[in-house]
């Protein structure tokens, strides 16, 4: 069977209407009459945002062409490189000191970054020998802590020390099931080495025994990873919302998936990573979901954060992950996990166990 993209791509409205259909690459399917035509996939113009200047969907297609061969050990090398990209700088752990709240470690702060916090000695307190950072003991209520730290982050944000303020609060807690001690601006979380949580949904379609993944291309207006490839649905877990509630919310906002359909998503585990980049220490746990979608499903972005979508054979997605840097880094981990669970990465491949282990390099607590 010839493989190709079943796609939704942006086309300027001056050239095509929002419902214009033009033929593109061919593939065969014996799917029901509700699915796309049997011998041709189509491009549907649904956006007007231009593609990223760094790469186009044509570049993605060119790098996906060669069929993925699980027995080829070089394939796992490419996957291992993507895992390593999410787990950089761990030899620099000694440059960080604990951030402690109520005698529990909630994060880690780089010694170099503490110079900015020392200017706010009515909010941040340092131990006698600088071994850890905590908050002023007078700040003993979550709301008071949230307001006080928000004041500091606003000042540091205005100075460009903490860029990309999102006005989205994340909980500060030592582990997932622990109560939150307070909340903090999402953009500041890596500067305090806080644990972060997110949901990632592998939205897939199955035809004639072959699986296809819906892939999104991030808007160029995104403050992080603009223009990169992403999951159909993915999003951080903010304060005051459960994982399931966030799943439903993100499904609707990012892909126009109804609650009825989102409720079919199956929780399949987690991946985790720890990454150090100068003053930032990212410690994230990603809740992974598989969602089998109807063959005639077409995603529609609702929040302006996605530029375009493509439906791509999983074997070709594997090649893009292995051979390129087109995907947002953390997405590669979730896709590699999907490849394990759906049999595209097999025990016969050298490095199989090492790759599997390293998908959970972070603290899954």
Curated annotation (Swiss-Prot):
GO molecular function: hydrolase activity; metal ion binding
Interval spanned by the transit peptide: 1-30
Cystine crosslinks: none
GO CC terms of this entry: chloroplast
Primary location: plastid
Cofactor(s) needed for function: Mg(2+); Mn(2+)
Residue numbers binding Mg(2+): 250, 254
Localisation: Plastid, Chloroplast
Keyword entries, A-Z: Chloroplast, Hydrolase, Magnesium, Manganese, Metal-binding, Plastid, Transit peptide
Short motif (Nudix box): ranges: 235-256
Pfam families, alphabetized: DUF4743, NUDIX
EC number from the UniProt entry: 3.6.1.-
Tissues where this protein is expressed: Expressed in leaves.
Function text: Probably mediates the hydrolysis of some nucleoside diphosphate derivatives.
Protein name: Nudix hydrolase 24, chloroplastic
Organism for this UniProt entry: Arabidopsis thaliana
Lineage: Eukaryota, Viridiplantae, Streptophyta, Embryophyta, Tracheophyta
Gene assigned in the entry: NUDT24
């Amino acid at each position: 069977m010839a493989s190709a993209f079943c796609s939704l791509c942006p086309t300027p409205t001056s050239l095509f209407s929002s419902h214009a259909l033009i033929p593109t690459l061919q593939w065969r399917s014996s799917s029901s009459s509700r699915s796309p035509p049997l011998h041709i996939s189509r491009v549907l113009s649904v956006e007007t945002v231009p593609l990223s200047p760094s790469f186009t969907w044509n570049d993605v297609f060119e790098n996906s062409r060669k069929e993925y061969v699980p027995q080829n050990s070089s394939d796992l090398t490419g996957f291992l490189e993507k895992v390593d990209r999410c787990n950089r700088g761990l030899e620099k752990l000694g440059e960080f000191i604990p951030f402690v709240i109520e005698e529990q470690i909630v994060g880690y702060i780089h010694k170099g970054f503490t110079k900015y916090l020392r200017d706010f000695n009515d909010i941040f307190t340092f131990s006698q020998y600088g071994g850890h950072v905590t908050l002023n003991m007078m700040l003993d209520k979550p709301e008071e802590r949230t307001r006080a730290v928000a004041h500091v982050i606003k000042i540091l944000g205005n100075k460009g020390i903490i860029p990309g303020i999102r006005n989205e609060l994340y909980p500060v807690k030592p582990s997932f099931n622990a109560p939150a001690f307070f909340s903090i601006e999402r953009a500041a979380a890596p500067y305090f080495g806080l644990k972060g949580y997110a949901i990632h949904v592998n939205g897939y379609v199955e035809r004639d025994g072959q699986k296809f993944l819906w892939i999104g291309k991030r808007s160029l207006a995104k403050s992080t990873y603009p223009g990169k490839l992403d999951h159909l649905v993915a999003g951080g877990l903010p304060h005051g919302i459960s994982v399931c509630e966030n799943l439903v919310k993100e499904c609707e906002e990012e892909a126009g998936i109804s609650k009825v359909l989102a409720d079919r998503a199956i929780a399949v585990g987690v991946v985790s990573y720890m990454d150090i980049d100068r003053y930032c220490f990212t410690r994230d746990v990603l809740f992974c979901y598989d969602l089998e979608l109807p063959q005639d499903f077409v995603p529609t972005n609702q929040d302006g954060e996605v530029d375009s979508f493509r439906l791509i054979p999983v074997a070709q997605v594997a090649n893009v992950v292995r051979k390129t840097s087109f995907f947002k880094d953390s997405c590669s981990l979730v896709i590699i996990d999907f490849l394990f669970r759906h049999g595209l990465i097999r025990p016969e491949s050298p490095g199989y166990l090492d790759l599997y282990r390293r998908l959970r390099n972070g603290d899954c607590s």
